[in-house]
Amino acid sequence: MRKYPVGIQSFESLRKEGYLYIDKTELIYRLISTGKYYFLSRPRRFGKSLLISTIEAYYSGQKELFQGLFIDGTEKNWISYPILHFDLSAQKYDSAESLYDILNDILAKWEKKYGTEPSEVSLSLRFQGIIQRAAEKAGKGVVILVDEYDKPMLQAIGNDNLQNTYRDTLKAFYGALKSKDQYIQFALLTGVTKFSKVSIFSDLNNLMDISFDKRYAELCGITENEIHTWLEEDLYDLAANTNMSYEQVCTSLKERYDGYHFTEDSNGLYNPFSLLNTFARMKFGNYWFETGTPSYLAQLLKQNKYNLTRLSNEVVTNDLLNGIDTLANSPIPVLYQSGYLTIKDYNSRFNVYTLGFPNKEVEEGFISYLLPYYAHVQPAESAFQIMSFIDEIEKGKIEAFFLRLQSFFADTPYEMIRDLELHYQNVLFILFKLLGFYTEAEYHTSDGRIDLLVKTGKFIYLMEFKLEGTAEEALAQINEKHYAIPFQADGRRIFKIGVNFSSKTRNIQKWIVEEI
């Protein structure tokens, strides 16, 4: 029976215990043969830790682990190097002392092996001393591997003072890579994000960022070709277990888990965590999203007064995508680098990228996740509320639908009055985007109004929301613009609905329904 490496981050365990391994060693060999200092950002659960572990096994000279892989037939000299492996992923960073304590513990462990000097009083000096003594003791360069270098910075988003403290600590710490260059054989730092202007790497001008490098676009993640090369029989097993055809399974996998692009002209990549979970459990699910979404993402969107309608079609420059500045007014870089948005198109003339959701799992999961942050609904109630909305709209229960919608706007904070139009737009966008996963829904905004078209098996709803004005004016707008004409021969019952919001009550004030 096939063993799928769900959650397996140790290359040694994976190989010795007979788990599936999709061979990435050709790219790894290219990486280690053509450069020395690298940085790679990829979303969480995308295989970064396994990549680090694989490189560690290579530099440990564990030739037996690579039997049958590309690198086995290419590498002739299997040499063991001293390795300094940092794993910052599993720690909690909530104070200035926490980062210091964690780095101190790591260094203390290595100092027991490589010694220390009285003059090495700072974290940076201690790290430099360890690098030099490890290299001198082994008679060869040191390999430095850092997994999730940015975990402290990410946990401090929203706390500028703590971020500044972490930035200064990490900048000095990683500066050892440059000052002890002659003692280093290879270095790779990985993380979810690239903090640019906060200057962690400002002194490391020798660090090559391969996050946007087409040559290494497939280093993490799984391509469609790799699925058919390594998992072809598994596709048939999945089809049998889900009562689907082979073609339906391939289409569903692509819709749910494919679609990640990290350069403008790369092949689409499947999320490895969701893909492997699907094969391991022999059923589809939102596996990546269920492992947790950081709360700071929703907070960033709200703090920056971001219009959520732009999520599906955000146009950005390369400079914006390529780093995160905590003082900037855009949440887009962190959404992109965290895997919630991806490259959909590229305009070479203007050197701009169009971003959107990579796939169905991310789009449905992220929109559902945002609902409690914007509407008056508890996270545990979200699924029930959406199910009720769909039931009401499919059964023509218009009054119940709008009463429920009113409850979504209940307790809108008074401070939202300045951005009331954006607040209304965002709540309605989330709601009708969620409805659109189960019904046909179209959403348009312009000049203080929102147009909504919802189609179900029996009904067509044409809705006009006025953010300033009356429900009567909203209904008149539908009639004047002849919105219903394209649907008059449809056969379904058609309802025109005019709705207005009150800035005084910060809620829906009135709705008028007219059936054709």
Region locations from a protein language model:
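Mg2+/Mn2+-dependent nuclease catalytic core
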Residues: 163-169, 467-484
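Phosphate-binding site recognition
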Residues: 1-420, 435
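Domain-level recognition of nuclease-like catalytic cores that cleave nucleotide substrates
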Residues: 486, 492-516
